[in-house]
Amino acid sequence: MSWQTYVDDHLMCEVDGNPGQQLSAAAIIGHDGSVWAQSSTFPKFKPEEITGIMKNFDEPGHLAPTGLYLGGTKYMVIQGEPIAVIRGKKGSGGVTIKKTGQALVFGVYDEPVTPGQCNLIVERLGDYLIEQGL
C-alpha cells in the first residue's frame, strides 16, 4: 500500500459514515520534514514549522507560549499526550498530530467534524503505523 493510499483511504475517509463529512486536510510527513503523502488541501508548510513540532514532542510545552504554526496558520496548543500527540485549536477547527517512530500523521479539521473525531482518525492510523514499526 502506498503512503498516498493511507492518506486517501484512512485519513480523508468519511467520518462516522457521513457522506461528505471528512477532515479538511491530512498528511504523513517524515521527522525530517519530507512529505511522504498529503491531501491536495494540506497547507504548504515551512521547514521551521515541522522543526518546532518535533521540538515540542521532545520538550512538551515548547509550543504553548507561541502557538503551533502549520502553513502560516496559528493554532492554540491544547491538551495532548506528551511525546505522542499534539493537538491544536483555531476557532471551530483544529489539528491533531500523532508521532510515530519515523513519521508525523497530521489531520486538520473544521466543523462539522469534531476534535474527537479527528483525534480518533489520526491516532488510529498512527497507532497502526507504530505497530508496523514505522
Swiss-Prot record:
<keyword id="KW-0963">Cytoplasm</keyword>
<dbReference type="GO" id="GO:0005938">
    <property type="term" value="C:cell cortex"/>
</dbReference>
<dbReference type="InterPro" id="IPR048278">
    <property type="entry name" value="PFN"/>
</dbReference>
<keyword id="KW-0009">Actin-binding</keyword>
<comment type="subunit">
    <text>Occurs in many kinds of cells as a complex with monomeric actin in a 1:1 ratio.</text>
</comment>
<protein>
    <recommendedName>
        <fullName>Profilin</fullName>
    </recommendedName>
</protein>
<dbReference type="GO" id="GO:0005856">
    <property type="term" value="C:cytoskeleton"/>
</dbReference>
<dbReference type="InterPro" id="IPR005455">
    <property type="entry name" value="PFN_euk"/>
</dbReference>
<keyword id="KW-0206">Cytoskeleton</keyword>
<comment type="function">
    <text>Binds to actin and affects the structure of the cytoskeleton. At high concentrations, profilin prevents the polymerization of actin, whereas it enhances it at low concentrations. By binding to PIP2, it inhibits the formation of IP3 and DG.</text>
</comment>
<dbReference type="InterPro" id="IPR027310">
    <property type="entry name" value="Profilin_CS"/>
</dbReference>
<dbReference type="GO" id="GO:0003785">
    <property type="term" value="F:actin monomer binding"/>
</dbReference>
<keyword id="KW-0020">Allergen</keyword>
<dbReference type="InterPro" id="IPR036140">
    <property type="entry name" value="PFN_sf"/>
</dbReference>
<comment type="similarity">
    <text>Belongs to the profilin family.</text>
</comment>
<dbReference type="Pfam" id="PF00235">
    <property type="entry name" value="Profilin"/>
</dbReference>
